[in-house]
Amino acid sequence: MGSSAKKKKEKKKDFQKTKLKVGKTKAKPDNFTDTSFRAKTITLNQQSLHITAPSSDAQFTHHVSLLSSKSDTQRRDSLAHLTTSLVSRPVDSPLPQPVSVLLPTLLPLILDASSSVRTQLLKLLRALPANDIQDHVPQLLPYIRAGMTHLAADIRVSAVEVLSWLVDVAGAEVVSCAGGWIKTLNCFLSVLGWHTEESSKWSGNRASFGKSGAKGQPMVKVLAALAVFLQAGIGRPDERMDDSSDEDSAPGVSGWEFPLCHAAQHMVPQATAPFVHLNLFGQPRDEEGEMYETREDRYRVFENRFLGAVQRGLESARGEGGEVGRASAGVSKVLKEAIAYGPGV
């Protein structure tokens, strides 16, 4: 019994306030640390100080590695730093890293879930040299087409914006690379809901672009991108370019083909394989993945597979009026010029 009373007394002591006597200091706790000393230096074992700061190239490489971070803010800030580095570099100076090294890290961000990351990515792509982008068009297009057929409406719009930039930078390479013509047109028709005769029986309605408050702005962007794409693929060639090419090919000779009719058809063709579309001795092939290097080949495929669907879609878009109707007028203008010019000579 005595031990239990002692334990109760000790427990009760913890909750009693100690009475301080005059002239005596308060008792210090057991975990008290004396901080009254003064030191001239403080040494940290894990501190690393360098006389020189990291170079701009090292910082550029570091931010490239941060593009795969799980944080949306980190990816956006890294893209902003890379964009600033590219814009502020001296004229005609090489990039800190070649485009072939940057693209494998940048391209997956086309499908990023964060809109701020995709917006900053487009700014970075526009800061890259156009000449360096032309050689990597086949590497860019699969990601763009994946974004154009994405389930999220904002990602589809961002992918269309990237495609518009790519056509402005390297339009000839986009429409002539393997799969760049038919596959991209199929993506446009899928987004716009302009189905061909084969797919109209089972395909659904036009893909949605999100909230109705957008007032047709996404649709306008898609139509504008389609107009630029068709202009690059089957648009009427510039007559001045044709004249200059003729002068370069035959200097000092003017109008030598006057007595002949369709003289270009009897000359050595400029294409590497002018009769490849006939597939005389080859095996059955995939038309969607082929390269259509000449305007004649692209117009032939467009007329056979897409012309009817595009014309029907333009009529329905023109009936909507407003900005969508004006955007469809731009596509109609390009289409009329292409049809008037025909397959060319």
Swiss-Prot record:
Signal peptide segment:
none
Q: What family classification does the UniProt entry report for this protein?
A: Belongs to the IPI1/TEX10 family.
The entry's protein name is: Pre-rRNA-processing protein ipi1
Keywords for the protein's UniProt record, in alphabetical order: Nucleus, Ribosome biogenesis, rRNA processing
Q: Per the record's keyword annotation, is rRNA processing included, yes or no?
A: yes
Q: What does this protein do?
A: Component of the RIX1 complex required for processing of ITS2 sequences from 35S pre-rRNA.
Q: Domain of life, per the record?
A: Eukaryota
Complex and partners: Component of the RIX1 complex, composed of ipi1, rix1/ipi2 and ipi3 in a 1:2:2 stoichiometry. The complex interacts (via rix1) with mdn1 (via its hexameric AAA ATPase ring) and the pre-60S ribosome particles.
Q: Provide the protein's localization.
A: Nucleus
- Enumerate the Pfam families for this protein: Ipi1_N
GO BP, sorted A to Z = rRNA processing
Q: Cellular component per GO?
A: nucleus; rixosome complex
